[in-house]
């Protein structure tokens, strides 16, 4: 098909009918100044010649720079009109002088450019003007060459031998026959071509030091005239010997080939070997697009600039078409390549020679399907159509279906014009499946008598095309005549029975529509695109009986840019940009590119809507199925990460035979995949296995037969078990699994899965056969469950449940889940399961491999608020541990899936978001502790925290390695349930169709997705498992591979359990930006900003002196680390130590009064005493006043002071010694006395009173003896000796509640609101604070000191953060709890709107009081009461925790008998 090197120039008829004669004017060789007065100002000169640093003139033409050029000259013909700046001459004179003026205009611009590099460049030279009567052809060009040589030799300003000359030889190929792909290789032009070559040889012999541009201006000169009715006209294809109409593809390929032929000729000529002479072909081609408008004439300035830009590009990269619209910016020589480019310094290699490389073998395959038989009788329904029933095949489309370039050898770009229809993916049938993979060759394996496929090469009307009616360059509108032609051919062909034979017709279109979209957005709109497809499909639907039509979705074409833009890949970019300019030319991130991507998606979406509208499913013997395998196509990559151009034809646009083969495999796979589960993404880097029809359901998939109900398609070819039963769980294949079992609650039991919408009463029915992890109803084709997936690998699987019934029903088999079950009941389920497996004769207990799925936790959360202790995360952890321990101890050969439970927030969203569909009136019965909580409430936050603790405890248990001690047992956490994406309806409400009628239990759609997600997780490596489930996603079932054939465990995933990095300090990051103090020192405490505070102080007990904040060197004595104290410590800076003073230092670095170190001398205004009780507060207040009055560092009257009072731990600890002598009234009275002293003695003071807490002893819970000072703690805190149910502890709860109630009133005491410069604010963050827990759900010891009664530095940091944040919250709206989660950015900032510390007055919350004496807001008392109840419960935790610790020391029990604390 290609040209031989010896006939490169001749073979393409390069010069048309001759060299156009030149118009000249006598003797003129200089420019008339008035013709182009604005030449230089037409474009900015952006180059910097000085930066090139070139001084010495070049000795070689291959290192010739613009600065070396002394003279610019031209010979040849230019019939280009002057630009708008030209003077108005007489029409006839202008016509005669146009060529000469065009030449002088162009050369002047070039001279102007060169003058910036070499100011001494001479005036340009053009051939003398002669009248039209004496125009010749090549002879005239020879005459001009001789005259030029003569004038150069006579020019006194030019050193003819030493000066470098730039000579431009213009010619015009007056015929477009070179655009004809089948142009004659011999003709009358040979002599003219030889003469042109003779002219170049003449210049080479006569002119030393010359760089010659060979420029064909035919398209620039002639193309506008095709539209003007002049003597020049486009030659007809017949006149050139073309076989038919010249297409856009023909045009762009032949343009490229024309240019490449010139380059190859010149590169291989003797010119390229010279040091003082070079000839370079400079192309001028228009962009090839739809002829919608007349191409505008080009002024000489634009032509000269385009020529200059071409000279600045290496040969082989001159791929920018001549623009008819915009003037492109001028290019500059680079420092790396400052010279004019020749063939030698461009390292040019002809692509016409590269094509001779060895052609890669075509890609075949093998089909090993067990069932290749047709239906027993010819089917009458398209929905029961087997592959072997197909007798006829056809196709419609464009060049990708016509097979352009599919068989071309690498580099043979000209051969892309050949249509290799026999290799076409959807319709070709060259050879057979072993060497050529196409859809017909696949189908011929099922029915060797298939008809209609194309073979060999040729156009759509060739004999070999048969029913392949695709046409290169076709768009969607061309499908209509193609469909008409195909129908006529089928009706009239005698080898087929038009009425009886089953037909497959594949339609694929859209690439050309997208490539030309920007040229004509209206014609190529998505609406017109799909309307044209509709009309074509309507013809098939109306006239073709017994047809299955593949409508292949248009490909994602934007990825072609990746191939085009990667300069490391050799591609003919001139061809690419001409074929698909709308895709390749827009800038990255441009609106044009975004528009294209959007249109591409709309093409796909509207096609999808058309096919799925049901328009073509009105007859039993006809259907159209959308095949989306091209929807998301990535460019194939090489092993080096480069775009793989072996996947493409030599033009880098069409498919190679390899990609045709992979497209065929992908189409076949799509045809067998269920609708809704079809593969949509491919990259074609690797071959695609030919899958077989499912033996249970062997039909081509349609919208009506596609997987029925809730089935799934499994495409795995490798389904064999291990050669011998594995002994290691880490080498377990799916086909090795013999037994499935499940444990859990109503979700696993299947409650309500099959219930009809609205049938709430039926939710109690346990549809175990549909359960995601253990159901075995139906088959995978209509019911997706884990057992049904595993049965595809091992048909002898057992253990799964069928039908309905409770756990004791024989249908349940090894599904021992019980509705309503909580974690504490899991151990009982395990024992029952183990016994059933041991007793059942169908199970070889010791030899059979088992998969056991465990899911529990939802019911614990539904009941957690009824007993916080019983449903604590620690107990959840222990129950789970006990159950798994039994499995680990008792069950051989088992893989246990531990599945995360459904987050209760999902339940709330669905249930509360659909009050008209969900039984909201039964919320308290169904799941009270989840569904009845108020939004943004403390209780809801507590539930969320407990949920996270449950999840963390599961992860911690598995990652402890406890169950990795045996080779035949493993527990794997499958986290797909961790994050659920709910389907949301258009009205914004969650879609209840995924749930049972109670809106709590999942329905069958939900269970189907759970099964798929579980299977995906089981094949994903540990550490890389999907932890998100989108309920609306198309989840395909992955397959084990030869490289990774096993169910994944930590060991075969090479996974190492993570270790948490140590935290270096407990500092905080300060993100506040408004640090300035008030413009003037405020006189009102209600206008007090943090930066106004000058002094800090504190009163309290050992929690304020920071006893035990750091580990002590002495085993007998805990040290007071006052510098780390939460409310008064000032050691270091905030970045390493979070304390209230260190926060305030960020606002005022000169703040005074804070403690440092451990000594009394550096305590500052920290007057707290370790053993202090409330009764000691007045004394501490007096001590503080005296210290302040005595200090010379502060101005007592003017400085603003922040004082924090926190007391009560010792009072409550000693309450049990003598309950009668401890009352809430007495406690508050002492506090009030201290506040009175401060009120009377200290001006300008803001007093924080922190609510009491008694939860510290809860640290003993679950610590297994962590606390080293248990007995001393009891002696220090006598209440720890009592049982939680004892009367004294019950009384302590009441006292605690009373204390907090009375304390909350202090902010509202009328006395403390009388002064403008004094305020008392109760900070309640401790009111509802929960014990900080670790990941296992046990009390986190890092918050506490060695004696377990005081805070560590981490605990002090959390208290400081909570106190600071309380200070920035309005009274009545303060946070009453602290969740102790670590975060360096938890500190709040004052806002521009509210820059002050909050007091009662500036909180705008002073209530209307009916009783002045009380001074208490009723709402606040109520809130305090609620908070006090919880704190009372925490007091109970204190005692029970210690009692549990005693029990553990007295009796070490096995894990399943760990005592449960009953709070």
UniProtKB/Swiss-Prot annotation:
EC primary class: hydrolase
Transmembrane residue ranges: 1420-1440
Basic and acidic residues bias (residue ranges): 360-375
Active site as annotated: 399, 513, 654
Glycosylation site positions: 173, 432, 492, 528, 589, 645, 782, 796, 1113, 1221, 1379, 1383
UniProt domain comment: Repeat 2 contains the catalytic domain.
Protein name: Phospholipase B1, membrane-associated
